[in-house]
Structure formats: structure tokens, C-alpha cells
């Protein structure tokens, strides 16, 4: 239990984490007395999932998965449990499992929340029009903040930054004063849009607003670190990354810190962070997890510049979810491996999606140049600069 004097010193993130831990402990104690209580078992699964999304701890996600599986085994495929399992599987890129999860409960695919997941699934699988139309239909039925944010994300990826920002603003309008973590997350996404356009001060302002709305959240601080690095404040950014990693040792953050050190000309400082990141990625893959395939592709393509290894991971990722992101990742890996014709083919597929992003266009420019198509290369360099005239500044591959 947190006393009032201690609570006053804790951040919003710490307070929520403590409340969640207390809820979990209370539910676990109660279930030891009444293990057949379906309502409490379901609430426990949801609170465990909430804690895992706060901390992004692999152990917390594993605990959540174990409780969900045990509850479904004990009580059968209840809708709320299957919906939670679908959310968990989607987060870890187990997309085939998402369909199975939703179909375990016959009426579940028609539920509003399940239709949102199916729209997300369509986007991840390259069915962009279906995803957009489903988001729009869901918003017509019920103007929820999360579906407005989903549609905003879609338009941001497709290059309409103005519409994306307006939709995020509308999402904020749907939130109440009790939903400050959600508000801060939406502010964070608006900052991400600013970063993608090279508007670093605007992004930093958004991130500061997010931090004021919900203090102490490592996710916000990680984005603040990127904004600092993009603005040339490298040592300040590196210090903040180290602080975030000390609390949330995610391998993608370790890789980012290593890349920042390389950008600063301090390759010796980078290597230990790269080794830690790669070890975690590979350990995850050995356990049968698939959600780091994209990171392994990026790591081998850009950190190690090992095109053959990058292409191997890229193909595995693409088998799970073929979309412009995985197509472009394979194209870049093939480029690194000197397979220019194949690289050009996959990049053409990625570009045909309509996605518009400075990094995508910069990579396209390099591939077209290698293929001897200099005019196309220049055109894509121009498109990259039109989106973000400061693309050469430090940025995170997301």
C-alpha cells in the first residue's frame, strides 16, 4: 500500500504500476480461495495484460499468456478471454493465431472490439483499403478515440500528415480527464508525425505535453531522447536512453543507443549495446517468438550490413505479414546483399501500396540508383526531402 506522502513523490506511471500490482495481488489471493470464479479469473488476465503493456516486460507477457491459456482450458473459449488472447497474439505478430482466437467464440468476430482487431490485421497483411473502410465504418457506429487513432495511423503511413493529425486531435476530444495515459499516448503519436516531417521542436513540444499529462512513462522519455538526438543534443539524448534502458531493457532501445553512438562517431561505445540487443533478439527467436524478425532484418542490414542474414530474416517476417514495411525491408536487405534486380522488384511492390515516408523514399532512391535509373533515384530523393528536409539527422527506425 502506498502512503499519501510517498504517493505525492511518485510519477503517474509509478502510481499506475503500483495500483495494477495491488489489483493483481488481491485477485490472486481471492482466486486461491475460489479458483472457479470465472469473473475474477478474467479480471486477473486483463490486469496482467495491462501490467505487461505498461512495462513491456517479457516475463510479464509470459505470465499473462499462461493465465489466459489456463483460463480458456478451465472455462472454455469465453469471449472476453478469446478477445484478450487475440490482442496478445496480435502484439507479438502471431497473426494466424489472431484469427483462430476470434473464431473460438462463435459470436466474437462480430463484436465491435474484435472488428477493430480484424481491421488492424487487414492493415498488417497489406489489405489497406479493407482496413481503412472498416475503421471508417466503426467510427460511424461509435466514435471511439482508439478507432480514430487507428484511422489517423493509417493516413499518417499513407502520407496525409495533416489529416492524420486532425484525426488524432479528434481522438483527444473523445477522452475524459480520467484517461490521461491515453491522452499522453495520442499526444505522443502527434509528435511522431512531427518527427517524420523533420519538425523536431514541434515534436519535442508534443512529447513534453505527453509527459506533463502522464509523468514518468518510459515510452515518452524514449521519444524525447530521439527528439534530442535529432536536434543534435547527442550526449543529453544518450544519457536519457541509458536511463530508460536501465528501467526498461528492451533490445530495440539498446540497438538505438548503439546507433546513436555510431552517429556520434563513438563506435567503441556502440558495440556493447549492439551485442546486448542482438543476443536478446536471437534468444527470442530461438524460443519461437516472431516479433523481433523485423528488428533482426534491420539489425543485419544496417548495423552489421550483412545482406544475406538480413534477407533471411526479412523473408521469414514477410511470410507472417506481407505489407509495404516488410516488402521494403526485404528490398533493402537484398540491396545490401547486392541483389539489385530482386531488390528493385520488392521495392516497387512496397511503393505500389501508396505508403509515403522519407525513409522509404530514401531507400528507394538508393536502390534505383544502383539499378542505373538515376532520374528515378533523384525523384525519390526529392520526395524524401519534401516530407522531411532534415532526413539526414538522427532518427529511429520504427
Predicted region positions:
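Residue-level recognition of tetratricopeptide repeat
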Residues: 46, 53, 87, 120, ...
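Structural motif corresponding to the intra-repeat A-B loop/turn of tetratricopeptide repeats
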Residues: 51, 55-58, 92, 125, ...
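N-terminal leader/linker segments that initiate helical-solenoid repeat arrays
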Residues: 1-80, 91, 100, 388-398
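Canonical tetratricopeptide repeat
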Residues: 43, 84, 117-118, 150, ...
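TPR-repeat structural position
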Residues: 20, 54, 61, 95, ...
Amino acid at each position: 500500500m502506498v502512503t499519501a506522502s510517498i504517493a505525492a513523490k511518485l510519477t503517474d506511471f509509478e502510481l499506475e504500476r503500483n495500483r495494477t500490482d495491488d489489483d493483481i495481488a488481491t485477485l490472486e489471493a481471492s482466486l486461491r480461495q475460489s479458483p472457479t470464479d470465472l469473473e475474477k479469473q478474467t479480471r486477473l488476465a486483463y490486469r496482467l495484460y495491462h501490467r505487461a503493456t505498461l512495462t513491456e516486460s517479457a516475463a510479464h507477457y509470459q505470465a499473462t499468456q499462461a493465465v489466459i491459456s489456463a483460463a480458456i482450458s478451465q472455462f472454455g473459449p469465453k469471449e472476453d478471454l478469446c478477445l484478450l488472447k487475440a490482442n496478445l497474439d496480435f502484439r507479438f505478430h502471431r497473426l494466424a493465431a489472431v484469427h483462430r482466437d476470434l473464431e473460438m467464440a462463435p459470436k466474437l468476430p462480430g463484436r465491435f472490439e474484435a472488428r477493430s482487431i480484424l481491421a488492424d490485421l487487414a492493415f498488417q497483411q497489406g489489405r489497406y483499403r479493407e482496413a481503412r473502410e472498416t475503421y471508417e465504418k466503426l467510427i460511424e457506429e461509435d466514435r471511439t478515440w482508439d478507432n480514430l487513432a487507428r484511422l489517423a495511423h493509417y493516413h499518417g503511413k499513407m502520407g496525409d500528415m495533416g489529416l492524420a493529425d486532425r484525426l488524432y486531435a479528434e481522438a483527444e476530444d473523445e477522452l475524459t480527464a480520467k484517461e490521461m495515459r491515453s491522452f499522453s499516448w495520442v499526444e505522443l503519436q502527434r509528435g511522431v508525425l512531427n518527427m517524420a516531417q523533420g519538425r523536431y521542436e514541434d515534436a519535442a513540444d508534443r512529447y513534453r505535453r505527453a509527459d506533463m499529462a502522464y509523468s514518468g512513462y518510459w515510452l515518452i522519455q524514449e521519444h524525447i531522447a530521439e527528439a534530442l538526438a535529432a536536434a543534435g543534443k547527442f550526449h543529453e539524448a544518450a544519457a536519457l536512453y541509458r536511463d530508460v534502458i536501465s528501467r526498461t531493457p528492451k533490445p530495440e532501445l539498446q540497438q538505438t543507443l548503439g546507433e546513436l553512438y555510431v552517429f556520434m562517431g563513438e563506435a567503441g561505445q556502440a558495440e556493447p549495446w549492439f551485442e546486448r540487443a542482438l543476443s536478446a533478439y536471437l534468444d527470442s527467436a530461438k524460443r519461437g517468438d516472431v516479433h523481433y524478425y523485423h528488428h533482426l532484418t534491420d539489425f543485419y542490414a544496417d548495423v552489421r550490413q550483412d545482406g544475406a542474414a538480413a534477407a533471411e530474416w526479412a523473408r521469414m517476417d514477410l511470410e507472417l505479414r506481407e505489407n509495404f514495411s516488410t516488402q521494403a525491408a526485404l528490398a533493402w536487405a537484398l540491396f545490401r546483399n547486392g541483389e539489385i534486380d530482386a531488390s528493385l522488384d520488392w521495392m516497387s511492390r512496397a511503393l505500389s501500396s501508396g505508403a509515403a515516408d522519407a525513409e522509404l523514399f530514401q531507400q528507394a532512391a538508393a536502390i534505383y540508383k544502383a539499378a542505373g535509373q538515376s532520374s528515378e533515384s533523384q525523384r525519390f530523393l526529392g520526395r524524401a526531402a519534401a516530407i522531411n528536409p532534415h532526413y539526414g539527422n538522427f532518427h529511429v527506425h520504427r
